[in-house]
């Protein structure tokens, strides 16, 4: 309705709140909000940048099921390029001692992975037998401007979790931040 982000959060801060939870389409918005107010700021997702609150939930879930993550192998599979969850989780899981592998076609990987504590493969079948967690990401179709895969069917064939791959995972934890694209990253018979 025309009010700037700064005006909104300064008004909320003037009410004496202890904290403000910010989810914004612009990368870095929570950082800016923290400069404007004298309250704790929680980043609930900013643009393509980060999603630390999702990461905290994922760390909690992983530790509840697996205990210590040190030495565990975690694959983050799918649309890494457009996923703020991938960025946050790669760092969080690696910080906890896990080996993190990104699995995606080149067109769905960020162009600059320097500094990411990960290895990269373009073949899910190379790592699926060795995983403790298979973390699937949805295709962020709304954030894509070009055709990044030949088809969703081909993406599913190469990178989707089908019954055969799910069986190969054994007791590994299957995770997804939602919402999922049924039949794209996860086969309907696995979901």
Q: Language model features by range: what are they?
A:
Residues 25-26, 47, 80-82, 138-144, ...:
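Short glycine-rich anion-binding loops that position phosphate/pyrophosphate groups of nucleotides
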Residues 113-188:
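Rossmann-like adenosine-cofactor binding region
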Residues 13, 33, 126-127, 190:
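Structural alpha-helical scaffold elements that stabilize or flank donor/cofactor-binding regions
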Residues 1-63, 181-182:
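Phosphate/diphosphate ligand-binding glycine-rich loop within oxidoreductases
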Residues 16, 36-38, 96, 114-116, ...:
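Short, structured coil segments at secondary-structure junctions
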Residues 1, 64-137:
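Glycine-rich phosphate/diphosphate-binding loop of Rossmann-like nucleotide-binding domains
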């Amino acid at each position: 309705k025309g009010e700037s982000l700064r005006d909104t959060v300064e008004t909320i801060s003037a009410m004496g709140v202890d904290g403000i939870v910010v989810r914004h389409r612009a990368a870095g918005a929570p950082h800016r909000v923290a400069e404007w107010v004298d309250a704790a700021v929680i980043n609930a997702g900013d643009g393509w940048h980060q999603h630390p609150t999702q990461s905290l939930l994922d760390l909690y879930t992983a530790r509840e099921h697996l205990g210590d993550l040190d030495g565990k192998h975690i694959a983050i599979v799918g649309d890494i390029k457009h996923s703020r969850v991938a960025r946050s989780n790669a760092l969080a899981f690696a910080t906890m001692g896990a080996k993190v592998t990104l699995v995606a076609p080149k067109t769905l990987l960020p162009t600059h992975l320097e500094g990411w504590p990960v290895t990269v493969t373009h073949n899910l079948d190379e790592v699926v037998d060795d995983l403790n967690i298979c973390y699937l990401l949805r295709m962020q179709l709304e954030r894509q401007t070009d055709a990044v895969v030949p088809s969703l069917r081909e993406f599913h064939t190469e990178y989707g979790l089908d019954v055969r791959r799910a069986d190969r995972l054994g007791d590994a934890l299957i995770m997804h931040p939602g919402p999922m694209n049924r039949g794209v990253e996860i086969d309907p018979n696995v979901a």
